[in-house]
Amino acid sequence: MKMMLVRRFRVLILMVFLVACALHIALDLLPRLERRGARPSGEPGCSCAQPAAEVAAPGWAQVRGRPGEPPAASSAAGDAGWPNKHTLRILQDFSSDPSSNLSSHSLEKLPPAAEPAERALRGRDPGALRPHDPAHRPLLRDPGPRRSESPPGPGGDASLLARLFEHPLYRVAVPPLTEEDVLFNVNSDTRLSPKAAENPDWPHAGAEGAEFLSPGEAAVDSYPNWLKFHIGINRYELYSRHNPAIEALLHDLSSQRITSVAMKSGGTQLKLIMTFQNYGQALFKPMKQTREQETPPDFFYFSDYERHNAEIAAFHLDRILDFRRVPPVAGRMVNMTKEIRDVTRDKKLWRTFFISPANNICFYGECSYYCSTEHALCGKPDQIEGSLAAFLPDLSLAKRKTWRNPWRRSYHKRKKAEWEVDPDYCEEVKQTPPYDSSHRILDVMDMTIFDFLMGNMDRHHYETFEKFGNETFIIHLDNGRGFGKYSHDELSILVPLQQCCRIRKSTYLRLQLLAKEEYKLSLLMAESLRGDQVAPVLYQPHLEALDRRLRVVLKAVRDCVERNGLHSVVDDDLDTEHRAASAR
């Protein structure tokens, strides 16, 4: 009797197992059957990239065109072959926390179509990297001033931005670049194309039927814009003034189809990693505050919201100041259902979606602050606004070093940092490497001015590219806590400049230029931000605060000059001999 019960129990367990397997198989086949049924021709489906006919079918999510955009333009990307929606790549990474320097956040294996790009950068392809070959040269160099072309920015030749970028202060060339001065040395004969990748479904963002470049044309033109951005990075700048890939990349960030979404690990607030159809990736910060809302006066700087529009505005401000140290950022309206929930494989993220009493789609994810039902992010009804910041090259390809900001705040409710109580703190900093022998202290002054103009108190660390050593620029990452208060100027942000009394001549002259009525900073920012998809990006009082804070910065420099003399305060980086010595 007992043996019969045991046998029946085993049979029951086996049946349950078989039923579970059958259900899993059915659930896996269901999306394919739906897509097959959605085709007019009813031809059999496959697990490869979707053909144009399938992309156009109602069962396959379509790329949204901008309002007023012709249907043909909005569907151009939809007519091209799409990669599998869960495909990820490891050529990039974006970092805002110190621990990000230790490991990559890649989620899946590199897809076959992206392997040639990685081989070209890693040097695993025998023909990709030739350090001693004449063809071994940087792909993207600054073409230099060209009056026949419109400068970067949404304005035309008659725009205020165009006039600014034609000014001599914005036409100073960087020193000649050597192999040691570029982040990636890629063989310019290596092209990314369907033939090179041996994959006919390599996504192309152009119109249907568009052909790839002939072998005689520049190979770099066949690369996706995110890769053009990466290979344009050098010792002196993240991107050159006249790099056309930057405007194209901004457009990609706001229009490329999102194929995969995952939560970014680390950090205090929710951020999403979004992957696009061309294997590019970006960091998505959702909207948490309206434009006119200010940071509550009782909030500490370390518990303030991270604002998506601050990330967008920071990129444009950095470019107007001619620092070019912020990765490209663009605003975008995202469909929370089709572009986040339906494409994510992150179960922790997926489980936090719900429908609010007002019938809006909401989610909250997982993070240290503001990730709960009470602080959920809700769409209208499923559209949410956010910023998308382009990833920097993956840490496995281009290591970055994280530095503690000497003027880091205490991040404590009661304690003060040393620099807040010691007026001679800068003298101690200037005796500490790398601030004792390099131009790093001048980079910190640039960063101080940048943060003061935005009102950003949250600059605890910064990063540099390891390849370039100490003689390189600071990357201005993670600017979401800027533009929080337009009615208050946080003078403590300016303490490094007041203590050290050092500034680059180029920075000082540009600040003076932007204080003039004909090149007013607020007007330049308004024009630059006007081209973003979520414009207006900044509330008008924030733009007016920029002009007010600029006057405060210039007064601080004048006070330093009166105390210490012009030559002790202003470092003449525009002098030819000085710049040649700096390059060495």
From Swiss-Prot:
GO terms for cellular component: endoplasmic reticulum lumen; extracellular exosome; extracellular space; Golgi apparatus; Golgi membrane; nucleoplasm. Its cofactor is Mn(2+). Glycans are attached at residues 101, 335, 470. Residues 62-81, 94-159 are annotated as: Disordered. Mn(2+) binds at residues 306, 478. Changing residue 46 to S: No effect on homodimer formation. Complete disruption of homodimer formation but no effect on secretion. The keyword Transcription does not apply. Residues 32-584 are lumenal. Changing residue 451 to N: In RNS; mild non-lethal form; decreased protein kinase activity. Pfam families: Fam20C. It is linked to Raine syndrome: An autosomal recessive osteosclerotic bone dysplasia with neonatal lethal outcome, although some patients survive into childhood. Clinical features include generalized increase in the density of all bones and a marked increase in the ossification of the skull, craniofacial dysplasia and microcephaly. Belongs to the FAM20 family. This is Extracellular serine/threonine protein kinase FAM20C.
